[in-house]
Amino acid sequence: MKRLDLLRWLEEHGCSLLREGGRHSVYVNRATGKSSTVPRHREINEFLARKICKDLELPAPK
C-alpha cells in the first residue's frame, strides 16, 4: 500500500499528525487518544498498515 493512501485513510477516519520523528511520523486518533507510528517509506506492507489501524482502533484499509 502506498504511504499517501494510508495517510489519507487515517485522516478520513479522524486521525491527525501529532509529530514528526527522525524516520517516522506519529499519528493520533483524537477520539480514543491512541497513537501509532507510520514509517516514511513509499510502500508500507499490508500487515503493517493493518497493525497501525488496529493500534488506532480504526477499520482496516481497503
What are the roles of these predicted feature ranges?
Residues H13-N29:
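Major-groove DNA-recognition helix of helix-turn-helix-type DNA-binding domains
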